[in-house]
């Protein structure tokens, strides 16, 4: 946890930073490692996960998970400028980048100098982070290690627990002594893939396919369910069509991110949860017993059943499971109302590998 300080540039500064980033990016893209995926053109988190799975399934199923403590706030300016100076020889560009690094931030309406770190919120910060951590990539490649890195989130995959512990010690030492960064030893650990959470994904071993596969991590699922409950809250005073619109945004975004994982059964469960909660929202929207009975009959529920349900006084949660209500507010009718199904989205092809 904790609060990150954002250095939000002015419009002019943002324009200048973007211009510099556009010049520097193609130069450094030629130097960056193939297994670096964060903040790079035509690369994404899903590609990092697919590469990690390939490595795990080659027998490298001991994971070194190194956590960099407040990386963006602790980058050493002199070390970073030295690294940049090896490639960029234009003094004006070097000067502008350094001025950007020391531009400072506002905290509680008071200016504070930036002695270390790259101000988050600017166009240059992600590129500078990759320039610094490319030194780590080169060191890991020199040691012959299997790794993937997404910005400051890096995992290394080796074949044994003994090797993993040795790599943890050696790479942590390199990060702290050579790069001047801080490793959070409390959060860093050696583990099997089943104990790993990486970029929101969890991992498991498929006994039938005899290989590791990815899935949404339990914490990612919990976060999704929390947001889904907020969007289907009965006391939220907006129309049900608006709720469906916001739900669809959540469903599409979450499913498109995690669709490379094994999630068919999970999608079926989550689709059911959403339909259940929407039925409660619709029941509340109908308000009076008379109106509820009338709407149920419009949806082909027999008159006797419609009035029994409308006047029974059961709680919303119980009524949403009622067979007649499920037959009235069917999956097909919710779909025609505009609700998107997770299950229908997961069959879209996986991202292209770089």
Which ranges hold each PLM region?
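A conserved non-catalytic segment of reverse transcriptases
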Residues: 102, 178-246, 250-252
């Amino acid at each position: 946890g904790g609060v990150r300080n954002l250095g939000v540039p002015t419009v002019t500064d943002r324009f200048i930073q973007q211009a510099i980033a556009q010049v520097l990016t193609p130069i450094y893209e030629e130097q960056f490692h193939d297994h670096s995926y964060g903040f790079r053109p035509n690369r994404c988190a899903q590609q990092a996960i697919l590469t990690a799975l390939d490595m795990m399934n080659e027998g490298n199923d001991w994971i070194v998970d190194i956590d960099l403590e407040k990386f963006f706030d602790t980058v050493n300016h002199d070390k970073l400028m030295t690294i940049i100076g090896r490639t960029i020889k234009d003094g004006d560009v070097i000067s502008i980048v350094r001025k950007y690094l020391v531009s400072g931030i506002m905290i509680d309406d008071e200016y504070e100098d930036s002695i270390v770190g790259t101000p988050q919120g600017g166009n240059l910060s992600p590129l500078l982070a990759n320039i610094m951590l490319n030194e780590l990539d080169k060191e890991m490649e020199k040691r012959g290690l299997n790794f993937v890195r997404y910005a400051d989130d890096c995992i290394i995959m080796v074949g044994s627990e003994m090797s993993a512990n040795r790599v943890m010690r050696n790479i942590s030492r390199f990060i702290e002594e050579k790069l001047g960064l801080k490793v959070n030893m409390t959060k860093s650990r050696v583990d099997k893939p089943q104990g790993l959470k990486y970029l929101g994904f969890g991992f498991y071993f498929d006994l039938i396919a005899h290989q590791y596969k990815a899935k949404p991590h339990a914490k990612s699922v919990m976060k999704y369910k929390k947001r889904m409950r907020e969007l289907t809250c009965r006391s939220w005073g907006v129309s049900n069509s608006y709720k469906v619109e916001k739900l669809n945004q959540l469903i599409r975004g979450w499913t498109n991110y995690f669709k490379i994982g094994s999630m068919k059964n999970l999608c079926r469960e989550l689709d059911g949860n959403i339909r259940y909660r929407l039925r409660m929202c619709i029941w509340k929207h109908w308000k009076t017993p008379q109106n509820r009975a009338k709407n149920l009959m419009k949806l082909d529920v027999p008159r006797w059943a419609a009035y029994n349900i409308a006047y029974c006084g059961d709680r919303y949660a119980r009524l949403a499971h009622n067979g007649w209500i499920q037959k009235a507010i069917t999956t097909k009718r919710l779909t025609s109302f505009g609700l998107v199904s997770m299950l229908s989205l997961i069959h879209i092809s996986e991202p292209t590998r770089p």
